[in-house]
């Protein structure tokens, strides 16, 4: 998968990088990177080409590599060796649980925004809107169908546009969330043994 290309390349280097760069700086760069990726995705349209679709996923591998190892280092920093396995296990549980909750919330948000955009678009679908009437006429001419079938065809396109606009809203929201939570990184105070702690938890 494109997401793993840069992540696989950068992951082995992270230990050396963390010896020279503070983990909080790396995590901050990762969050900025995630936000940038979501901004790119917020530009999607229903006519998106394959390159535009793959590029953000490919680039996401960079902040992914910059994020997970420093995050582990921050979490495990300052803990005695006998506490590291438990802390690593707990952090993994919280990550999976938060991911599940976040996925559910975003899916609900996407559905709500799709309904909103569908409502806004259908408000414009009337006989007084020249673009709408032209679309119906073009569908009838191209498909050689009656008005009701042409209307159904236009409705399908409207549904797709509403879903795309709703998804773009979620991407914008995701980018904003990553920017807003950056200060939380700097509330932490990782110790000098942060990189070693992350390496020690690699198998967990």
Tell me the role of every PLM-derived stretch.
Residues 91-190, 195, 199-204:
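Hydrophobic transmembrane architecture of multi-pass small-molecule transporters
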Residues 1-86, 193-204:
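Transmembrane core module of solute transporters
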